């Protein structure tokens, strides 16, 4: 999912005014480009960016690194979706090796991807919450990370 196009100056100026009045503490952006982030930062402080990103959809790889360098949080939306059957088989193999679920491995990969990534996975029950929390305890070996990185490699090299 590509970021929205166009200027965000007008709506973001309104949000910045609410922040100035003390009605909003922090402001973040969702589904934005680097240019839109720069536009918003010229208006007020930004604490996070939330864009479409997961193991299979990796267009923001460089953006995440830039944000980490600048101390800004990155919240991937749709962190568990969009895997093809071939990608899922690679994820299944990693999960079997770790005695975990494929989704736990996908979340663990995100957590190990960069220190500025904050996850908010959908959780529909206490059992699901426990499953998601276990992802934080998984440690993916470097060779497994390298293999999982290949899942999104084709998309990153596409024109």
Label each region the model flagged.
Residues 2-159:
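Beta/alpha (TIM)-barrel catalytic core signal, keyed to glycine-rich beta->alpha loops juxtaposed to Asp/Glu
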